[in-house]
Amino acid sequence: MRPICRAGAALIRSAELNAPTPELAANFAVLTLGHIARPYPYALTRVVTGPGDVVEPRVQHPIFFGSFDWHSCVHGHWLLARVLRLYPDLEIAPRIRAHFDAAFTAAKTAGEVALFERPASRGFERPYGWAWLLKLAAELSRLGGPWGEILAPLSGLIAARLCAFLPKADYPIRSGAHFNTAFALVLALDYARTARDDVLADLIVEKACAWHGADADCQAWEPSGDDFLSPALVEALLMRRVLELATFRRWFAAFLPQASAGRPVSLFVPARVSDRTDGKIAHLDGLNLSRAWCWRGIASALDAADPVRNRALVAAEQHLASALPHLSADYMGEHWLASFALLALCEVP
């Protein structure tokens, strides 16, 4: 992919939509279709209980067997669904629809459900993969067509699992990677509100406030060396989603009281990525993209006269520009980064 962001913001974001330009969206889709059905390499993360469990990834993951791992394949499908909804007349749109018709069948959904129903898979992909699956379900619902209904047995199962899990999750997980609970709740809340699942939505709001409502004076000791999420900023984004506007502004002022001065500095400066062939270090490109997403979401809730707002928007653009040229630099990033670029460009409340 050519370094589009170096050509200027007009080539990145549509002036009419809170979205990437059609050209960039098509590039994202081409990139994703190139790996979403690529079976290898593939990272297995499930628990094996016997010889019968050692099977090809495609056997146990009949839909989500590509893109290096289960969760990346899930959010690759989310990207395609979002692009299709944004620009249904793109030249690549028929390829996306054909892929969805082949991927989303009742039999394949049943195969995905079967894995989750195994006793050893109780915590499989919790919470990151769960959240992305729910995000995909929400997008398919908005898109229309049969695919969301076909996937409903799996999305319903995962929503129920999350409802059962949250009441006993006494503490948040504040990591910068897959186990971060704030990120998972941001995505799951979108599903709950789209599906009108009030039980899940209320649980998410309740848990977010219990975990983070009293947080203040965040020190933001980040990034860590393999972060793709900012624990500080994704927490703030979650609270932006669950609190009333005035309440969020008060909470944010206490959470990052020096933000108007650009501190903590680490939150405003893009992370350096020293080796994009190293799967863990390559996470830092994702960190820069997810920070752009978070800063844009936070800025949208701040008063126009608040000096933090401009700093947040500038930081978002700097983080986006640092990562966009590198989405296909190596397969360690190529199999997932475009989804986070799309979040940064169009997922602002």
Question: Residue spans of the language-model regions?
Answer:
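Extended ligand-binding groove/face enriched in aromatic
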Residues: 74, 83-192
